[in-house]
A protein has these predicted regions:
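Positively charged n-region of N-terminal signal peptides that target proteins for export
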Residues: 1-4
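Bacterial N-terminal signal peptides
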Residues: 7-16
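Lipid interaction determinants
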Residues: 20-169
C-alpha cells in the first residue's frame, strides 16, 4: 500500500513539474514575423480606455533586432481634401501611433518573455528616446502583449497597455 502511495506521489510530482503547452516559455524566435492587431486597451488605475477606439487596425513587425508598430483607429474618416486642415491634422495625430526601435529580450517571467525596445523614431515626441517594456506570451495562435506602465502617445497618460495580435499572412 505504501509503495502504491509513493508511486502515485512520485507521478504527481513529475506531472506537476512538466509544463503544459500553454505554460511553455516564450522564445525570441516565436516573436519574429508580422502580427495583425486584434485589440488595444489602456488601463489607468481602475479606468479602462481604448485610445484608438474599439476598432483598432494595424500591425507589429518584429525582426531579430527591430520592433515596428503602427496602429490606427479603423473608423477614422478620410480627409475632405489632400491638404489637411489644422483640425484634421490634430485629429489624425490622435487616431494613430507608430514607432520603431531596437529591442532586447530578457528573462521569462510568469507574465511572459520581457522585451525592452529603445524608441529611435516615433510619431509622437512623447515616446521618442524612451524604453518601452512589454511582457509577451502566447495563447494558441495569439500573441498577448502587456506593458507594466508606458506613456500612451494619443493621450499622454501613463497606463498599462495591452494588445492582442495574430500572425499576419
Amino acid at each position: 500500500m505504501n509503495k502504491v502511495l509513493l508511486a502515485i506521489a512520485a507521478f504527481a510530482l513529475v506531472a506537476a513539474a512538466v509544463p503544459s503547452y500553454a505554460q511553455q516559455a516564450t522564445t525570441k524566435d516565436q516573436l519574429i514575423g508580422s502580427w495583425k492587431v486584434l485589440s488595444l486597451k489602456a488601463t489607468t488605475g481602475d479606468r479602462v480606455s481604448y485610445p484608438l477606439g474599439e476598432q483598432v487596425s494595424g500591425y507589429v513587425t518584429i525582426t531579430p533586432t527591430r520592433f515596428w508598430l503602427l496602429f490606427v483607429d479603423a473608423t477614422r474618416k478620410a480627409p475632405a481634401a489632400p491638404a489637411l486642415t489644422d483640425a484634421e491634422a490634430v485629429a489624425m495625430m490622435r487616431t494613430q501611433v507608430a514607432w520603431t526601435g531596437k529591442y532586447t529580450t530578457a528573462e521569462q517571467t510568469a507574465e511572459g518573455i520581457k522585451l525592452t525596445a529603445r524608441v529611435d523614431a516615433a510619431s509622437s515626441q512623447a515616446i521618442f528616446d524612451t524604453d518601452r517594456v512589454y511582457f509577451i506570451r502566447f495563447d494558441g495562435n495569439k500573441m498577448m502583449v502587456k506593458s507594466p506602465s508606458v506613456i500612451v502617445p494619443m493621450t499622454g497618460a501613463t497606463s498599462i497597455v495591452e494588445f492582442e495580435l495574430v500572425k499576419a499572412d
